[in-house]
Regions:
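Surface-exposed interaction patch
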Residues: 48-125
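Short, polar/proline-rich extracytoplasmic segments that appear immediately after membrane translocation
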Residues: 9, 19-69, 154-175
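Generic short beta-strand segments
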Residues: 43, 75-81, 145-153
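Bacterial N-terminal signal peptides that target proteins for export
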Residues: 1-8
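N-terminal secretion-targeting helices of virulence/extracellular proteins
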Residues: 24-25, 34-36, 113-132
């Protein structure tokens, strides 16, 4: 029996101490910005009806063509630099506008959550509305409809404007 123990101990001594091996290497990762691919209609048509109502688009659909990330609308900027149309602040009373005034309050966003595209505290030819990331979100490969609301005064004269405002929509990937 002692002979077997001695044989086992001598075999272990010949092998030496067993130690795990370790080494290190650097892993390099390079990321490139993911291209955002969003489809937005190129024009919006409004009709200010004779009875004081407005016909606004019901099919202004924004499509997130990405298959990997949700996107959020974070800002809308509007400008009427070359036209007579102007944006009104929240405090303006459109019932007091002069007849044929091209001053409007312009709201847009998700149904029931429309935001005023505001020029600030006074009437202006430019304005913007902002959303927090997640307020107007579109899932990957899905679409979402944008709704509009316009407050305005009365018109005596029929008017047609081929272009009233330029609009820029800014999107971001959800965090």
């Amino acid at each position: 029996m002692n002979r077997i123990k001695l044989l086992a101990l001598s075999s272990l001594a010949l092998l030496g101490t067993i130690m795990p091996a370790s080494a290190s290497t650097t892993v390099k990762i390079e990321t490139r910005a993911t291209q955002m691919n969003v489809t937005v209609p190129s024009s919006i048509e409004f009709v200010f009806n004779e009875d004081g109502t407005n016909t606004t688009p019901t099919n202004f659909e924004i499509t997130n063509n990405s298959n990997i990330a949700r996107i959020s609308l974070v800002k809308v900027q509007m400008s009427s630099q070359s036209t007579q149309w102007r944006l009104l602040p929240e405090t303006a009373d459109t019932k007091l506008l002069a007849v044929d005034s091209k001053d409007i309050q312009f709201y847009m966003g998700a149904q029931g959550k429309e935001k005023l595209v505001s020029p600030g505290s006074v009437v202006g030819s430019t304005g913007q509305a902002t959303w927090s990331a997640g307020e107007f979100t579109i899932e990957p490969t899905k679409s979402k409809n944008m709704v509009f609301k316009v407050n305005r005064g009365a018109f005596n004269t029929a008017q047609t404007s081929a272009k009233a405002f330029d609009m820029v929509l800014t999107f971001t990937y959800n965090q």
